[in-house]
């Protein structure tokens, strides 16, 4: 089908090439043979009067013209999918929808397991593809490659709608047999004990406690670096090390690992886990249904107001006379990516 001289099928080809950045993978994703894909690329180049892609090894590198086309083409295809192809009504009991959700393993364990159980009852054919957090999460949302992003709200972009899910705070965890971990941890003890620290690939956004230390020119003693909060408890077992973890996750691991929870000697701000979705999914019935379930289940974990008040009370009662501890209360939120 042509529209003002453009074969509209070529827009699907262009979108697949921008996503896969590989000719063979793009052809496979839209069920075209490689010769047919090569012919489609030639037609795209002829229509737009631009190379669109150059080869670097086996990777397709888009030209500035291709980059400028990527977003409007993707938006047009998504609008067609959501407004024309998709049915007006969404029936959860009959739907076979698969939701692609980017989230941490921490949130998967403490929150999303309940979502899976709920959906299995209400919509048995609905499925999920849970993906790790990536640095380009904003781009994934923009292109509609994920349906939802769940992560701490301060790290989210302002380019997409979002909703708060539940409040969380960081605590210090250690093995129950750790004799060097007192019931009231001082700042000096915190800095001197060997730590298991989390460092994600999101290099431009340091963790909350890391940001505090960086702001004050401080460096803690790190024995082991892991890529996930869930890897901290095994590294603490039978050792004198400590680790900083979300309270709910420590409570989860406490059932199977001998852990002890101690308040941090830092007045770190509590944070909110939030859900974000592409703006063009705002009116999508399936997305609305899923958002309602996320919000309903998150409400069972306690309101953000209650969590914030609990944290404020706890921190104020545990503040030390150390001026660094007092300054930590002035810690700014991490910058949005």
From Swiss-Prot:
Domain of life assignment: Bacteria
Disulfide cysteine pairs (residue numbers): none
Domain HTH lysR-type: 6-63
InterPro entries assigned to the protein according to its UniProt record, in alphabetical order: LysR-type_TF (IPR050389), LysR_subst-bd (IPR005119), NodD_PBP2 (IPR037416), Tscrpt_reg_HTH_LysR (IPR000847), WH-like_DNA-bd_sf (IPR036388), WH_DNA-bd_sf (IPR036390)
Gene Ontology terms for molecular function: DNA binding; DNA-binding transcription factor activity
UniProt-listed Gene3D superfamilies: Periplasmic binding protein-like II, Winged helix-like DNA-binding domain superfamily/Winged helix DNA-binding domain
Record bears the keyword Transcription: yes
Pfam families: HTH_1, LysR_substrate
CDD domains found in the cross-reference section: PBP2_NodD
Residues within the DNA-binding region(s): 23-42
Stored SUPFAM superfamilies: Periplasmic binding protein-like II (SSF53850), Winged helix' DNA-binding domain (SSF46785)
Keywords: Activator, DNA-binding, Nodulation, Repressor, Transcription, Transcription regulation
Free-text function comment from the UniProt entry: NodD regulates the expression of the nodABCFE genes which encode other nodulation proteins. NodD is also a negative regulator of its own expression. Binds flavonoids as inducers.
Remarks, miscellaneous: There are at least two nodD genes in B.sp strain NC92.
Family the entry assigns: Belongs to the LysR transcriptional regulatory family.
Protein known as: Nodulation protein D 2
């Amino acid at each position: 089908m042509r529209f003002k001289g453009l074969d509209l099928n070529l827009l699907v080809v262009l979108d697949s090439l921008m996503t896969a950045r590989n000719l063979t993978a793009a052809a496979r994703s839209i069920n075209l043979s490689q010769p047919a894909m090569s012919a489609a690329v030639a037609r795209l180049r002829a229509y737009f009067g631009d190379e669109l892609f150059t080869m670097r090894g086996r990777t397709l590198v888009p030209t500035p013209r291709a980059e400028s086309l990527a977003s409007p083409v993707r938006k047009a295809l998504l609008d067609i999918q959501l407004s024309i192809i998709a049915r007006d009504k969404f029936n959860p009991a009959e739907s076979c929808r698969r939701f692609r959700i980017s989230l941490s393993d921490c949130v998967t364990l403490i929150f999303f397991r309940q979502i899976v159980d709920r959906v299995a009852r209400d919509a048995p054919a609905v499925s999920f593809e849970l993906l790790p957090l990536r640095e380009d999460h904003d781009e994934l949302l923009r292109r509609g490659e994920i349906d939802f992003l769940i992560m701490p709200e301060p790290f989210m972009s302002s380019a997409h709608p979002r909703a708060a899910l539940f409040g969380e705070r960081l605590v210090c965890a250690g093995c129950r047999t750790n004799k060097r971990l007192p019931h009231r941890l001082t700042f000096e003890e915190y800095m001197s004990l060997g730590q298991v620290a989390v460092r994600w690939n999101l290099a431009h956004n340091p963790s909350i406690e890391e940001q505090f230390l960086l702001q004050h020119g401080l460096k803690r003693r790190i024995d082991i670096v892991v890529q996930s909060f869930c890897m901290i408890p095994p590294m603490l077992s039978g050792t004198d090390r400590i680790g900083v973890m979300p309270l709910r996750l420590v409570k989860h691991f406490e059932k199977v690992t001998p852990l002890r929870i101690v308040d941090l000697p830092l007045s770190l701000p509590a944070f909110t886990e939030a859900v974000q979705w592409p703006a063009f999914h705002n009116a999508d019935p399936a997305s609305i249904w899923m958002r309602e379930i996320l919000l309903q289940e998150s409400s069972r974990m306690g309101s953000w107001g209650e969590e914030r008040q609990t944290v404020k009370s706890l921190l104020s009662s545990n503040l030390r006379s150390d001026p660094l501890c007092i300054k930590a209360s002035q810690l700014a939120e991490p910058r949005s990516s």
